[in-house]
């Protein structure tokens, strides 16, 4: 069969790629600085390829994907010309899967990697008589940062996370920095966003900080302001949307160990945007998380915090509508 070159041109949505022998590990941090992303690559979540997809064009009727075996089930989505045609569930120990019966027409192929498990890629093959080429995207790039609610462990499949749905609806190329339990607004992540040229940025603020009792009334706004200031060092005019937490059941009015509630955090997140705009930053905007999922959607939060698969689909549609006024495609920003 005919191998596809796996590199930064065909593996999209990763921040960097780590070569391990004959394997490639997509990372959602800069590999060269990996020791600085403490603890242990954001507790391992930077190694999980949420939003990462192998992307190319081909006329092949068959494809084979090879990877390192896992101790767990691993899901992949196969998307042809922006339509999901199959979710492949790979069993523990398996090292490949094949998709056949495709048309001989020229098509865009996207193979979404798992948003739940680490994936080490080995090869992708098309038919030996088929042609393939790098997909030259004209889409704008969008980077989103958040928690497990952005990583979307409970999504129906890898291409059904809310960021993937939003990106598809708005015709954007996605970079997803959703790190389960790790959205603490540390400077290394701010530097990562600063040093990744994109057209649009969205930041979700609050729920991991509430759950981790990380910052109090004195430090909550200060850490997020500093985070955005770092991004602005190299991306001064790129639109940034800062969103506050979605509905969080008892967390709404129950203070955490440092005295914050989600109600108070939303007020402070909104105020952060007002501070930036008052000081001349007209490219930063606020989205209230309750406009995405509110108390009326509590049935979509089975554990009172994380959305289920239907909840993530709704979030994808709602965020697309919320971001659309700010992510204007005719805007061109220099990095």
What are these regions (language model features)?
Residues 102, 111-197:
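Serine-esterase "nucleophile elbow" of acetyl-processing enzymes
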Residues 235-240:
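A short helix->loop->beta-strand "cap" motif at the edges of active sites that frequently abuts
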Residues 250-287, 314, 333:
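Substrate-gating cap/lid alpha-helix
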């Amino acid at each position: 069969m005919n191998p596809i070159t796996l590199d930064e041109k065909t593996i999209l949505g990763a921040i960097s790629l780590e070569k391990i022998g004959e394997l490639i590990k997509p990372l959602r941090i800069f590999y060269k600085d990996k020791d600085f992303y403490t603890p242990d690559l954001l507790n391992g979540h930077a190694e999980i390829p949420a939003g990462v997809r192998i992307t190319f064009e081909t006329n092949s009727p068959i494809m084979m994907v090879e990877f390192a075996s896992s101790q767990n089930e691993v899901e992949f989505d196969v998307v042809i010309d922006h339509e999901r045609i199959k979710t492949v569930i790979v069993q523990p120990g398996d090292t490949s899967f094949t998709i056949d019966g495709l048309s001989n027409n020229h098509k865009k192929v996207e193979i979404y990697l798992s948003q739940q498990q680490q994936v080490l890629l080995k090869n992708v093959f098309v038919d030996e008589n088929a042609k393939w080429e790098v997909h030259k995207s004209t889409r704008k790039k969008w980077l989103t940062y958040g928690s497990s609610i952005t990583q979307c462990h409970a999504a129906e499949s890898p291409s059904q996370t809310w960021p993937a749905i939003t990106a598809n609806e708005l015709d954007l190329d996605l970079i997803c920095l959703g790190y389960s339990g790790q959205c603490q607004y540390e400077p290394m992540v701010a530097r990562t966003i600063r040093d990744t040229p994109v057209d649009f940025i969205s930041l979700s603020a609050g729920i991991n900080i509430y759950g981790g009792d990380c910052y109090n009334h004195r430090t909550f706004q200060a850490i997020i302001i500093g985070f955005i200031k770092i991004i602005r060092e190299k991306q001064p005019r790129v639109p940034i949307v800062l969103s506050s937490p979605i509905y969080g059941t008892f967390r709404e009015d129950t203070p955490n160990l440092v005295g914050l509630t989600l109600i108070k955090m939303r007020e402070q997140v909104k105020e952060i945007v007002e501070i930036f705009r008052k000081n001349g930053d007209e490219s930063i905007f606020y989205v209230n998380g309750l406009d995405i999922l509110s108390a009326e959607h509590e049935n979509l939060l089975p554990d009172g915090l994380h959305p289920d698969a239907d909840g993530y689909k709704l979030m994808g549609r709602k965020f697309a509508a919320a971001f659309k006024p700010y992510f204007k495609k005719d805007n061109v920003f220099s990095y």
